[in-house]
Regions:
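Conserved functional hotspots at enzyme active or ligand-binding sites that engage polyanionic ligands
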Residues: 1-114
C-alpha cells in the first residue's frame, strides 16, 4: 500500500469518541512523504464530509463534486486532524489538486499558529 501526501483514501474511523468524526469516509492524507515512504504504522489525516458548511472558512476546505473522484460536494474538516493506524485505510480514491492542497496548508498554519 503506497500512501502519498494529499491523496484521498477511504478509511474506517469507527469507533468514534465524543466530537470525533466517525464512520467509513474519505480522508485526506496530511503526513509528509518522508514518513509515508518508510514502514510507518500510522498516518496523519483530516476527515472529509459531504455535510458542506460554507461559512466555516478556515475550518473547512471545499472539494467540488467530481474533483479527486469524489461523487459529492465535500469539505475537508481541517480542525479534526488525527493520526490513524494504517489498517483503517481501505482504498485510495484520488489526489487533491495543487490549488486545494495549498489552501489546506494555509488553513493548517492558521489553526495551528505555525
Amino acid at each position: 500500500m503506497q500512501i502519498k501526501q494529499f491523496d484521498i483514501w477511504l478509511a474506517d474511523l469507527n469507533p468514534q469518541i465524543g466530537t470525533e468524526t466517525g464512520k467509513t469516509r474519505p480522508v485526506l492524507i496530511l503526513q509528509t512523504n518522508l514518513l509515508n515512504k518508510i514502514p510507518h504504522p500510522s498516518t496523519i489525516i483530516c476527515p472529509i464530509t459531504n455535510n458542506v458548511v460554507t461559512e466555516a472558512k478556515i475550518l473547512r476546505v471545499n472539494i467540488p463534486r467530481g474533483v479527486a473522484n469524489l461523487s459529492e460536494n465535500s469539505d475537508i474538516i481541517i480542525d479534526q486532524i488525527r493520526a490513524i493506524n494504517n489498517k483503517r485505510l481501505i482504498k485510495r480514491i484520488g489526489t487533491l489538486p495543487e490549488n486545494l492542497s495549498v489552501l489546506v496548508k494555509q488553513n493548517l498554519k492558521i489553526i495551528m499558529d505555525l
